[in-house]
Amino acid sequence: MARAEFQMPEDFLDQLSRLEARTDEIVPKVLAAGGEVVLEHVRTRLRAVIGQGTKSPSRSTDELEAALGVSPARLNRNGDWDVKVGFAEPRRGKGDSNAKIANIIEFGKHGQPPRPFLKVAKAASRDGAKAAMIDKLDEEVGKL
């Protein structure tokens, strides 16, 4: 059986060890960069669908848009890093939760047609978020 052996350059191995030591600093920054791209797409789509196609004039208070945000990067129970784009709770005053209102807008209800904004924003932002995360990772690796 043929056998090949490769030796990695010493400077490359040093850079990998420095990268390993700073992973917990770098990963949240990279995910935050991607999360901001997704957040802007969701915010744009939400603005486009609120008040559109209604029978009566819109009574929107922009409270749903104001509650939209990005969570800090955290390790989940599987050991993977997550960042979430979603709505803060609770809503000011009385009424339904932000998640319920977003769900009604996204999927509709009896007498109210669906106006998807999350699914469309997710699909539209995928490439941009990947590019932003790659750029941020390259920037952080370049600092090593």
List each language-model region with its residue ranges:
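Short, Lys/Arg-rich flexible segments
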Residues: 1-84, 89-93, 98-144
